[in-house]
């Protein structure tokens, strides 16, 4: 039952954060910099695949070890590191191949990925600890 709590809480926190941040901060920033290269609406399939893979990674590498060790702080750190790595891969690849990419996008997205991933992992472990 505990792994399901970790997965569910991680997903809820992550998706709420994304639902707030993406339309209000990240999309306007991306539109400003890469403008016409963006789709009018999201491709939900690839987005869902990212969320499944990333939340699975957060569960395996951050929340399960954090819960096992009794440390939500370790989950936060490991989650932030995984978020940094995941978002850095995307950003550095995009910066390498896209004409209109910028260091501003790279920094903003990597900071966001680190923060939301760490926060999601931390909250998930705290909630799971409360139910243990």
Residues of each region from the PLM?
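Juxtamembrane/disordered regions of integral membrane proteins
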Residues: 1-132
């Amino acid at each position: 039952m505990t792994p399901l709590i970790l997965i569910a809480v991680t997903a809820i926190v992550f998706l709420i954060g994304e639902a707030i941040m993406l339309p209000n901060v990240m999309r306007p920033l991306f539109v400003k910099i890469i403008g016409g290269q963006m789709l009018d609406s999201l491709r939900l399939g690839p987005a869902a695949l990212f969320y499944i893979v990333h939340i699975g990674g957060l569960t395996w590498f951050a929340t399960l070890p954090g819960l096992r060790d009794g440390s939500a702080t370790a989950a936060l750190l490991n989650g932030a590191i995984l978020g940094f790595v995941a978002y850095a891969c995307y950003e550095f690849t995009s910066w390498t191949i896209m004409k209109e990419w910028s260091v501003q996008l790279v920094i903003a997205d990597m900071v966001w990925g680190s923060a939301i991933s760490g926060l999601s992992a931390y909250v998930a472990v705290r909630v799971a600890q409360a139910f243990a």
